[in-house]
Structures are given as C-alpha cells and as structure tokens.
C-alpha cells in the first residue's frame, strides 16, 4: 500500500516533527511512503533525507491518483500546518488530529492572510453569534483569546478540518469522545508512541548544564504557554523553601511569559530556552522529578510527557483532557482547582521524602509506556487502519506481531 504523508519535519520546530521522524521508520515496514512537506526548506534529519522520497507540496502539480491513501498530520500551528490544511481541503484524506482545538491555527491564518471576513464567516458558520463574538475579540488585545480559556474545548473550530476528513486518528479517549457524536466516519484512537531511550551519564549531564550533582532536580520541558501553569508551579516550589531543589525550565518562551512569574526568593531556577532533542532528553534523564501540567487544554497529547515517563520519572500532570487517560498508578494527577498549588507541594514533598514511592511511580510510568505505547504497536495500528480504509486486508495486531516487528 502506497501513501502520501503530509507532516512538518525538522527544522520546523514542533512536537509533530519529532513524532514523525521516529514513527516514519517503523511505519515504512508496512507501507510505501512518500513525504510531502512545505515548500522552502530542507529537512535536517539526514536519515529521513536518505531513506524517504521527500517532495515539496505544489498544489498545481500534486496528483493523488498515485496513492492508495493520503495521510495528513494536523496540528494547531499555522506556520507548520498551513500547507497541510490547504492540501486537505483540495484532496480529502485520513487526518491525524494532534490537537482538538484549532482556534489558534485559524487566528494565525487570518493574521497571515488578513482576511478577517473569511475568519468571521467560519466562526459564525459553526457557532452563530457566539462565533462572531469570538472572531471580534481577536481584534481586542485586552480580551483573553478563546484558546487560552477553558471554553476552547466547547468551540474548537475543528469542524472545517473534519468535514474534509475521510477518517480520523486521535491519540486520546478525550478527543475521541468529543468528536464521535458529530463525526459519522471512521475514527480510531492510537496512542502516541514511546520514544527510543538513550543512555546518559547523570553527573556529566548536570555538570554540562551547570546543575549541582547533588541537587534535587525538577524539570519541565516544552513550549512555554499560559496553560502550562508555571505561575502556580513556581509559587508552589518557592513556598517549599527547600534549598536542595533546582527547577529547570526548557522550552521556547514565545510570549516572554516567564518574566511575569519570577521574583521568587527561595527557589533556584534555571531557564534553558529551546534545547535540541538530544539535550532535552539528557535533561529529562538527569532529572529526579518532572512536572507537566496543562490547563486549559486544547485537547493535545504530550510527547514531552511520554519522554518523561519513558525515562522512568515520576511526573505531576493535570487530571484533565488526554492526561486523565493515563492510569492513576503511572502519573501523579492534580485537579486544576483551588487546591492545585497545595497538591504540587504535597506530591513533591512526598516524592522527596519517600524514595521507594518515588522509584515505584517512575517504574510504573516506564512500564506503561513500554507496554501500551511501543512504537511497533502504534505503527501496526496505523498501518492496519489505513489498509482497512483502502479496502485492503488489515494487519494482525498481536503481541507476537509486535515482537516480530521489533526484530526487523
């Protein structure tokens, strides 16, 4: 079976680029894949360049008739996914919906093309007067945009994409349940895949990053947004007043938000900014505890969370959205309510004081990711679903088939 796969690749800095640069090599065991990327850049991953046919997407010359299926990886970043949206609207196919809420995508699209009337019509088409109000608020910088509020999940603006989808792949029950009542075509949940683990020298990593080898290292990684709860996290860790704690934040601060939360007196904070993937994994591997909160959610899944769990770290997460899908024994869940800060303090204190508990949570996290999110299992599920959509015999998804793939 031959497919055309549309996805950003590095150096386009999105989690979806990283996701596919690992998944591609497993998926090609089952499918013949041509990659279609945005015009104007060259992928930096040498292995991807060497092993796959990569084409810039040119609307005037693209011919879908040479493929059994078209697979579109859709996210909320217009810069990375704008060309994918345009291709999907012209040539419907199977959509991997990485983000449930696409309000930010359309706002960036309007900002890029300046067509406010089109943007307003789209909002009004799906949400009536409320949609028109959402569109008008974009022009008022003093108003909180919809994608930074809890109301975003009620007005996701994904309908336009779903109308062009022949079938949909999602990564959480949260998104599947939100979509399935109004979407009457095939939909399947496939877990985000685990990432290949590397071996790091803990003390060397800490030395290279300027972190004391004896520090209690807590880390958060990924893009810095308001919904990552850094204001609450920093306040909670500061109130613990534990000089052994070093908190490292690694990620691009697009809105320069962290400056609003600093001024803490009792906490050793290191801000690393954007790190390349190797350094990011090294930081996680050298950490004692990880924090990955997110509220309100846009329905996204977190590759950062799977990396943290895969490396056997106890992780504090928000008990909402896709994070709530994880078993209680594999992560430490915190409700996004008035007690959020107190539970951060309580969990961190318990993890520091009870080494056996800390180790057990990390081990269960790693086991869950290893068993339920193996890249071999996820690739088999992708290929089987796509073959079924193309009226081809689906693949066997069994433990034996997964183990056989690991040896290939």
Feature-to-residue mapping (PLM):
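Conserved donor-binding/catalytic core segment of Leloir-type glycosyltransferases
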Residues: 5, 169, 212-228, 234-237
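Glycosyltransferase donor-sugar binding loop
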Residues: 40-41, 221, 246-259
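A short, active-site helix/loop in glycosyltransferases that binds the activated sugar's phosphate group
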Residues: 146-187, 194-196
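A short helix/loop element that forms part of the nucleotide-sugar donor recognition site in Leloir-type
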Residues: 198-211
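A short, well-ordered alpha-helix in the C-terminal region of glycosyltransferases
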Residues: 207, 350, 357-372, 378-384
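Nucleotide-activated donor-binding/catalytic signature segment of Leloir-type glycosyltransferases, i.e.
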Residues: 258-281
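Short hydrophobic beta-strand element within catalytic cores of glycosyltransferases
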Residues: 310, 314-317
């Amino acid at each position: 079976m031959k497919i055309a796969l549309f996805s950003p690749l590095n150096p386009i800095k999105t989690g979806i680029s990283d996701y596919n640069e690992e998944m591609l090599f497993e998926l090609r065991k089952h499918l013949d894949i041509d990659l279609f990327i945005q015009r104007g850049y060259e992928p930096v991953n040498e292995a991807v360049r060497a092993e796959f046919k990569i084409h810039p997407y040119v609307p005037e010359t693209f011919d879908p008739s040479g493929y059994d299926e078209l697979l579109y990886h859709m996210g909320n970043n217009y810069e990375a996914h704008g060309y994918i949206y345009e291709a999907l609207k012209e040539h419907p196919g199977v959509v991997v919906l990485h983000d449930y809420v696409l309000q930010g995508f359309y706002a960036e699209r309007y900002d890029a093309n300046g067509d406010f009337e089109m943007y307003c019509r789209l909002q009004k088409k799906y949400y009536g007067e409320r949609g028109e109000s959402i569109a008008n608020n974009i022009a008022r910088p003093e108003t909180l945009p919809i994608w930074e509020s809890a109301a975003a999940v009620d007005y996701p603006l994904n309908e336009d994409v779903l109308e062009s989808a022949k079938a949909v792949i999602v990564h959480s029950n949260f998104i599947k349940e939100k979509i399935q009542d109004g979407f009457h075509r095939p939909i399947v949940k496939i877990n985000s895949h685990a990432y290949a683990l590397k071996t790091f020298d803990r003390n060397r990593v800490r030395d290279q990053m300027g972190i004391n080898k004896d520090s209690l290292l807590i880390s958060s990684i990924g893009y810095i947004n308001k919904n990552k709860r850094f204001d609450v996290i920093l306040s909670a860790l500061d109130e613990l007043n534990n000089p052994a704690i070093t908190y490292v934040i690694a990620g691009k601060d697009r809105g320069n938000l962290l400056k609003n939360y600093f001024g803490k007196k009792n906490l050793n904070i290191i801000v690393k900014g954007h790190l390349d993937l190797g350094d990011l994994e090294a930081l996680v591997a050298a950490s004692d505890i990880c924090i990955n909160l997110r509220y309100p959610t846009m329905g996204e899944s977190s590759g950062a969370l799977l990396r943290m769990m895969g490396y056997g770290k106890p992780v504090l997460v928000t008990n909402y959205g896709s994070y709530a899908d994880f078993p209680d024994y594999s992560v430490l869940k915190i409700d996004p309510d008035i007690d959020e800060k107190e539970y951060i303090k309580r969990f961190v204190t318990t993890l520091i004081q009870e080494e056996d508990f800390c180790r057990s949570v990390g081990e269960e996290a790693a086991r869950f990711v290893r068993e339920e999110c193996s890249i071999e299992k996820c690739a088999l599920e992708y290929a089987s679903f796509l073959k079924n959509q193309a009226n081809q015999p689906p693949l066997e998804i069994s433990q034996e088939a997964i183990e056989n793939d690991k040896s290939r």
